[in-house]
Amino acid sequence: GNGWYNESTLDNWDWTVDNFGTGSFGTGPGNDITIGGNYIYTETSGAGSNKTATVNSLCVNTTNLTTPNIRFSYHMFGATMGTLELLVDDVVVWSQSGNLGDQWLTAQIPLPSDSNVLIQFRGLTGTSFTSDMALDELVVDDGIPAGCTDTLAANYSPTASVDDGSCTYVLGCTDSTANN
C-alpha cells in the first residue's frame, strides 16, 4: 500500500513495520520521528551477523520534478550497529555505519532527473542484537534547500533549510569550536 516492499530473493532478512520500540534494550528507536506513527526497522535479535535486509520502492518517476531528491529519517542506535545504504538504480549513493546515538537523523540525497528510478535501502546487520536500524518519513520531492545553516560559519547560507554538513569556520576547519 505504501509503495515499498521487502526484497525476497537477494537478501536474507526483512524490514518490519513498528511503532513503539524494537523490543531490544540498548538499540533501535523508542518511537517514530513524529511520535505516534510507524517506521520500518531491521530486528537483529536472532539474525546473526552480516545479514542483509533490502526494502525496494516501486519505480519512481522524477520527470515532473525540477531538483528531485529523496529525504528520509534514519535511526542507528546500538553498540554493534551495522551499515545502512541507499541505492539508486543499484548504485550505492549514500552510506552510514556504526552507532550514531539514540536519535533520529535526516538525510537528503539528489536523484537523477527525467527518469524512472528504483530506490533501495539496504541494511547490513552488525555482530549482535544491538544493531536495530530504522527508517521513517521517506519522501521523494523537489527537496528542501540544503547548505550551511550555522550563522557563525564562514559559508552560512541564509536560504538553506537543511544543514548538509558543509559548514566551514576558521581556515577551512569544520569544527565550530576551533580557535585557530
Language model feature labels by segment:
Residues 1-45:
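Extracellular glycan-recognition surfaces and repeat-rich motifs
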Residues 90-114:
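Extracellular carbohydrate recognition and processing domains
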Residues 144-180:
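Extracellular calcium-associated, cysteine-rich motifs in secreted modular proteins
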Residues 55-76, 84, 116-125:
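Extracellular beta-strand-rich recognition modules
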Residues 38-39, 44-69, 105-106:
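Short beta-strands within extracellular/lumenal beta-sheet-rich domains
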Residues 32, 76-78:
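Extracellular acidic, Ser/Thr/Pro-rich low-complexity tracts
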Residues 83-90:
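Short, surface-exposed beta-strand/strand-loop-strand elements in extracellular ectodomains
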Residues 48-54, 125-143:
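Extracellular carbohydrate recognition
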